[in-house]
C-alpha cells in the first residue's frame, strides 16, 4: 500500500498538471376565462389554507448573441463549451426586431450543519485520519486524487484544517470517485484565472459542505420598498467575502388576497470556495460528461474588487453533457459575469444539457447580462425549495432574467422563493436614449425569463418582490417570435412584482406564446399586488398578453381558474391588459376571480 502511495505521489508530482384589463396594438387574442374556482365567497376560504412561510432563514456583451466561450480546461480532455452547437440558436430578439406594442420561498433558512448526511453519508476511508485533513493547496490536490485514501466504493471524506490557496485544476473522474469535502469553516482561495479548481466528469461526484456554517440572522428591519432589493457582500481586508445580506419578500394568503412583508437576512460566511482570479472564462466548479456536484452547505463565491471595475468569472458553477447540480443548502453568491449565468450556468454539448435540482440554499448577489443568478440553455431547472434572491442584470446593457433566464429549457417551480431580483437596464436613463419609446417591452424578466422553446411550469412557490426596469416584473414568458412550447400556471403566488417602463407587472406573455392558468381543485394560485408604472396606453398590472406582428401570431391566454386581484397599472388594465383590436371572449361559468384591481388612466377599478 505504501509503495503504491509513493508511486502515486511521484507520478503526481512529475506531471504537476493535477488532473484532478384590455388594450394595446393590433392583435387577434382570445382570453377564455372559465374559472373552475368557486365564486368569490368560496375564494374567501383561501384564508383557511395554510401557506408555507419563509423560515428564518453590472459588460461587454450583447443580447443579440448569447453565445459564450469555448474554454478548453488546459491539461484536461474536457471540450466543454457554452458555445452553442450547429443548429442551435442562443440569440434573442432585440427591440429593432420587434414591433412596438402600440403598432400595427419555501425555506430561506440555512440549516446548521449537523455532520449527518443521512443515506448519502460517505464515511472516512480506512487509514490514518490525519491523511484526510488538508492544510495546503498541495495536500488538496494530492489527497483528493489518491485512490489509496478511498474505500472500496471510491468514497472518501476530507476536511480542511486551515485556509489554503490552490492554483491547480483538480480533475475528479470516473463513477468510482465519490469525494466529500468539509470546508470546516475555512476557505479555499483559487488563484488561477484560466482553469477551474474542480473539474468533475465521467460519473464522478463531489459533495461540498461546511460543518461550521451557522444559520442566517434576521435583524430588526423596517424598509418599505418591497421589490428589487439587491443582495450585498461585505469583505475582509483581502476583498474575500465574509458577509452576505439578502432579502425575501414573504407572502402570506389572507382572505381573497395576499399580504407581503420584506425580510432581511444576514449571513456570516465561514467555509468557502473563492475564485480569486479575474478571467471572464473561468468556471470555478466545472462539470461535463455526467459529473455530479452536491452543495449541502458552505459558500461558493468570488473575490470582490474595491474599485469600480468588478472581477469577473464565466460562472461559479458550470455544468453540461448530462451533468447534475444538486443544491440543498449553502450559498452561491457575489459573482459577476460578462457572459451569462454568473452564479450557476447550465449549457449544452453534444446535444446534451444539464440539470439543476434546487431543494435548498440561497443563490444571491450575482450579476450578468443574462441570467444573473441562474442561466440555462437546453437544460432543466427543478426548484422545489431554496431561495434565488437579489441577483441582477447590468444597468448599462439590455438583459433578461435577473433571477433565472432559460432558453430552450424546461423550468419547473414547485416551492421556494424567487424574490427581489432586479432586471436593471432602463432605456430612459441611458445617454442618447432619452427619447426612446417607453414600454417597448423587448427586455425584462425580473424574476424569471424563459423563451426560445422549452417549458415554464409554476405549480407552487413564490415569485415575489422582483423588479424589471422594462417588462415582466415577475415573469417574462416568451420573447418576440421565440415562444415557449408550454407555459402553465397551476399554483403558487406571484405577488408584489413591478414592471417600471413597460407592461406586465406580474407576468408578460410575449407573442406567440400560449399561456394556460389552470388550478387543480384544492390548490390555490394568486396573482396579487403587482404593478406596472408605464403611463402609455397599455399596462397589465397583473398580466399582459402581447399582440401579433409581421409573421408572428398573437400571444394568447386561457384562464380556467386563478385569483387576480389588487394589482395596479398607471396606464390601463390593472388586472390584465391585452390588445384592443382583437377578439376577447370571457365566459363567466363558475364565477370570476378577477376583481379589485386598479388603473390610473381608466380612472376606475378593473
Give the ranges of each region predicted by the language model.
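Short, T/G/N/S-enriched strand-turn elements that build extracellular solenoid repeat scaffolds
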Residues: 140-151, 166-174, 181, 293, ...
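Polar/charged low-complexity regions in secreted precursors and cytosolic/nuclear IDRs
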Residues: 69-70, 114, 290, 297-298, ...
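Gram-positive cell-envelope targeting signals
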Residues: 1-53, 160, 374, 404, ...
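Right-handed parallel beta-helix
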Residues: 183-186, 205-227, 246-247, 263-272, ...
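Glycine-centered small-residue motifs that form tight turns
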Residues: 280-285, 309-317, 323, 339-348, ...
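Glycine-rich repeat segments that build the extracellular carbohydrate-interaction surface of secreted
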Residues: 132-134, 148-166, 178-184
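Extracellular beta-strand-rich solenoid/capping regions of secreted or surface-exposed proteins
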Residues: 165-180, 189-211, 215-220, 227-245, ...
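Low-complexity, acidic Ser/Thr/Pro-rich repeat tracts that form intrinsically disordered stalk/linker regions
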Residues: 1-13, 36-146
